[in-house]
A protein has these predicted regions:
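Short, well-ordered beta-strand elements within core beta-sheets of diverse protein domains
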Residues: 42-49, 64-70, 156, 268-271, ...
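Rossmann-like NAD(P) dinucleotide-binding subdomain of oxidoreductase/dehydrogenase enzymes
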Residues: 132-278, 403
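ALDH superfamily catalytic-core signature
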Residues: 202, 242-383, 411, 448, ...
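Structural signal for hydrophobic packing residues in well-ordered secondary-structure cores
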Residues: 65, 69, 84-91, 95, ...
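Residue-level signal for inorganic ion chemistry
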Residues: 40, 76, 98, 120, ...
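Hydrophobic face of alpha-helices
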Residues: 58, 77-84, 95, 113, ...
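Conserved C-terminal structural/oligomerization subdomain of aldehyde/semialdehyde dehydrogenase
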Residues: 39-44, 209, 232, 269, ...
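N-terminal Rossmann-like NAD(P)+-binding subdomain of aldehyde/semialdehyde dehydrogenases
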Residues: 1-142
Length: 507
């Protein structure tokens, strides 16, 4: 483990407060202890930001913004290009640290770093495409257009399940847009954030920059400081619905902006004509991958009654063959849950599901023989969409429901408070298009013959209802990090008014 930490410039006690290459601050005297969820062993410690240091970080980001916004966007893109290249050099050690600190399997940890690289590549191209529209003026000798300006220093508050990728979705795009970023990572995964800050600092030093990418590790008090501060025009928050509501309300009181990525109770509909082999593989990846701790994890399976028993048998057989164990070991497909609290939440959900008429088809047992936070992934057949099915439990529980007709399938699919990701498996063009239509899925992401997880960075990521409505990553999500300005230029020698208005001498 020491060799891995050395590659990432990590030591037994690390500062969690930084404003750039020469901006590491000592942090609080009460460190956050990072533990390995696989073994329960201590990895290292991080000193969190004090209130005064959080303010210092905000001031540094604010000062840097005034210079950074003046740099041409394509030049900012070159900086982000070099950040992506620096991440390429350290893909394996950083990915393994993600696995060590969070518990997802090694392939997923490395894949998460690849996601960071991909979004940097996307942002580089975007830096030359921050387009505004040109409009025809109704007045002669006038031109109208719109342009986009950066907002300012932003707060990015991320969750444990994607400890580095979600930061990059925000930071890479915000940076090419001309914003500076303050990162408050999850208390469960502070080391990955410190490692990324070291990598970013190396790139910033090459350009003589500071205050562009900033770090403030800490508990909820650091998050509250960021959300309450009017110097930060935008807060991007990824986490629970409960905390997301508080963030949204707090920022709204000061009329700031938010990007909220909250709960996801994602469903797959399996039509009677579906390719069940393809569906089984997608469901397994969506429900078991990352031990069911993705925002886009498959949590509900809505299957036509004609194929439900057959698909259930296939899934039970597949679940019983899932290799559970050390996420750094070759061949493992499911590692641990992140904390003992998560294990307890899974057990409570299963108990409630049975009380509500559910039948556990397979799994659900804790596996202390493997480590403190290991569980077996569970499939629970439910008689209907009961209260526990409508909740999001961040664990590998898959609820299986059946439907008789299309209207019932859509009603079940949309009948939850969340609206992040969705999918259907069908070989019918008509059924697929119905699912994608306005009368079909009500989610921000809707897929056909592919699961709910594994979104590409080229599309905007986010959802509706209690998912929060925010959009990150690709497409035109960049507009959320900028302010729109409409411009009118009069190049004539007259002063015609809009709508043909006559004012003053002209009667």
């Amino acid at each position: 483990m020491k060799s891995l930490l050395d590659k990432l410039n990590l030591v037994p006690l690390n500062s969690g407060v930084c404003t750039g290459p020469d901006g590491w601050l000592p942090g609080s005297t009460e460190p956050i202890i990072s533990t390995n969820p696989t073994t329960g062993e201590v990895i290292a410690a991080v000193s969190p930001a004090t209130p005064a240091q959080t303010d210092q970080v905000i001031r540094a980001a604010q000062t840097a913004f005034h210079t950074w916004r003046q740099m041409p966007a394509p030049r900012r893109g070159l900086v982000v290009r070099d950040l992506g290249n620096a991440l390429r050099e350290l893909t394996e050690p950083l990915g393994e640290l993600v696995t060590l600190e969070m518990g997802k399997i090694r392939a997923e940890g490395i894949g998460e770093v690849q996601e960071m690289i991909d979004i940097c590549d996307f942002a580089v191209g975007l830096s030359r495409q921050l387009y505004g529209l040109t409009m025809h003026s109704e007045r002669p000798g006038h031109r109208m257009y719109e342009q986009w300006h950066p907002l300012g220093p932003l707060g990015v508050i991320t969750a444990f399940n994607f400890p580095v990728a979600v930061w990059s979705w925000n930071a890479a795009i915000a940076a090419v847009c001309g914003d500076t970023v303050i990162w408050k990572p999850s208390e469960l995964t502070p080391l990955t954030a410190v490692a990324v800050q070291h990598i970013a600092n190396r790139v910033m030093a090459d350009y003589g920059l500071s205050g562009i990418f900033n770090l403030a590790v800490g508990d909820g008090s650091v998050g509250r400081t960021l959300t309450e501060d009017p110097r930060l025009p935008l807060i991007s928050f990824t986490g629970s619905v409960r905390t997301g509501r508080l963030v949204g309300e707090t920022v709204a009181r000061r009329l700031g902006r938010t990007i909220l990525e909250l709960g996801g109770n994602n469903a797959i509909i399996v039509a009677p004509d579906a390719n069940l082999e393809l569906a089984t593989r997608a469901i397994l990846f969506g429900a078991v991958g990352t031990a069911g701790q993705r925002c886009t994890s498959t949590r509900r399976l809505i299957v036509h009654e004609d194929v439900a028993d057959h698909l259930a048998d296939r899934l039970v057989n597949a679940y019983r063959q899932v290799p559970i164990g050390d996420p750094l070991a070759a061949g493992t497909l499911m590692g641990p849950l992140v904390t003992a609290t998560a294990v307890a939440a899974m057990q409570r959900a299963l108990t409630q599901a049975v009380a509500e008429g559910g039948e556990i088809l397979t799994g659900g047992q804790a596996r202390p023989d493997l480590g403190p936070h290991f569980v077996e992934p569970a499939i629970v057949r439910m008689p209907t969409q009961t209260p526990i099915v409508r909740e999001e439990t961040f664990a590998p529980i898959l609820y299986l429901l059946t439907y008789a007709d299309w209207e019932e399938a859509v009603r079940l699919h949309n009948g939850v408070p969340q609206g992040l990701s969705s999918a259907i498996f069908t070989d019918s063009l008509q059924t697929a298009e119905a699912f994608l239509s306005v009368a079909g899925s009500d989610c921000g992401i809707a897929n056909v013959n592919i699961g709910t997880s594994g979104a590409e960075i080229g599309g905007a990521f986010g959802g509706e209802k209690e998912t929060g409505g925010g959009r990150e990553s690709g497409s035109d999500a960049w507009k959320g990090y900028m302010r729109r300005q409409t411009n009118t230029i009069n190049w004539s020698r007259e002063l015609p008014l809009a709508q043909g208005l006559k004012f003053g001498d002209e009667t």
